[in-house]
Amino acid sequence: MKPNIHPEYVTTEVTCSCGNTFTTRSTAKGGSIHVETCSACHPFYTGKQRVLDTAGRVAKFQQKYAKVQAKKGK
């Protein structure tokens, strides 16, 4: 490997929005990373399902295809 071209590989603290923190190593500057989901709160790892924006998607779908249903009903 060439000397003096690789970024510094330092200990970094990762903080999740759920409050969970853990330490890893990274080339990120500042020594800390903030994430929205981690293995402690992600539905895949916890086994609990969370609905994020289903209501908005359903409403958007119904608005989009309401005209089609009205034409079929006539």
UniProtKB/Swiss-Prot annotation:
Residues engaged in binding Zn(2+): C16, C18, C38, C41
Keyword field: Metal-binding, Ribonucleoprotein, Ribosomal protein, RNA-binding, rRNA-binding, Zinc
GO biological process, one term: translation
Cofactor(s) required for function per UniProt: Zn(2+)
Assembly and oligomerization: Part of the 50S ribosomal subunit.
Organism name: Salinispora arenicola (strain CNS-205)
GO-annotated molecular function: metal ion binding; rRNA binding; structural constituent of ribosome
HAMAP family in UniProt: Ribosomal_bL31_1
Biological function: Binds the 23S rRNA.
Keyword match RNA-binding: yes
Protein name: Large ribosomal subunit protein bL31
Family: Belongs to the bacterial ribosomal protein bL31 family. Type A subfamily.
Listed GO CC annotations: ribonucleoprotein complex; ribosome
